[in-house]
């Protein structure tokens, strides 16, 4: 059974797993490759804290999203409603278009 907090995450194409965290980094929900991954939650929380600190340096745009791209997968991080949503998504390699 999915909760309203995670129902949209489960429908993301090529999704390999997800974490929903509180602002302090506590895991509220998880599934797939990221199920109960407290270590990754801590790392992501630190990265979010650093990204949020840029606002103090004069950047007026609030931090909302961050992508961490690796060769075969990407972590998509979004802050919404005092929660941090992390989705691990498989990168789909596409052939270049010839024109």
UniProtKB/Swiss-Prot annotation:
Broad class of where this protein is predominantly found: other
Subunit composition and interactions: Part of the Ragulator complex composed of lamtor1, lamtor2, lamtor3, lamtor4 and lamtor5. The Ragulator complex interacts with slc38a9; the probable amino acid sensor. Component of the lysosomal folliculin complex (LFC).
Protein name listed in UniProt: Ragulator complex protein LAMTOR4
Gene Ontology biological process terms from the UniProt entry: cellular response to amino acid stimulus; positive regulation of TOR signaling; positive regulation of TORC1 signaling; protein localization to lysosome; regulation of cell size
Family: Belongs to the LAMTOR4 family.
Function: As part of the Ragulator complex it is involved in amino acid sensing and activation of mTORC1, a signaling complex promoting cell growth in response to growth factors, energy levels, and amino acids. Activated by amino acids through a mechanism involving the lysosomal V-ATPase, the Ragulator plays a dual role for the small GTPases Rag (RagA/RRAGA, RagB/RRAGB, RagC/RRAGC and/or RagD/RRAGD): it (1) acts as a guanine nucleotide exchange factor (GEF), activating the small GTPases Rag and (2) mediates recruitment of Rag GTPases to the lysosome membrane.
A GO cellular-component term linked to this record: Ragulator complex
Keywords annotated in UniProt: Lysosome, Phosphoprotein
Record organism: Xenopus tropicalis
């Amino acid at each position: 059974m999915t909760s309203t907090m995670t129902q949209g995450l489960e429908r993301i194409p090529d999704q390999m797993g997800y974490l929903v965290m509180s602002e302090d980094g506590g895991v509220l929900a998880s599934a797939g490759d990221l199920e109960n991954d407290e270590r990754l939650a801590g790392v992501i929380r630190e990265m979010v804290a650093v990204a949020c600190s840029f606002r103090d340096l004069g950047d007026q745009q609030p931090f909302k999203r961050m992508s961490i791209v690796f060769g075969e997968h990407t972590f998509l991080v979004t802050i919404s409603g005092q929660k941090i949503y992390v989705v691990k998504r498989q990168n789909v390699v596409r052939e270049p278009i010839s024109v």
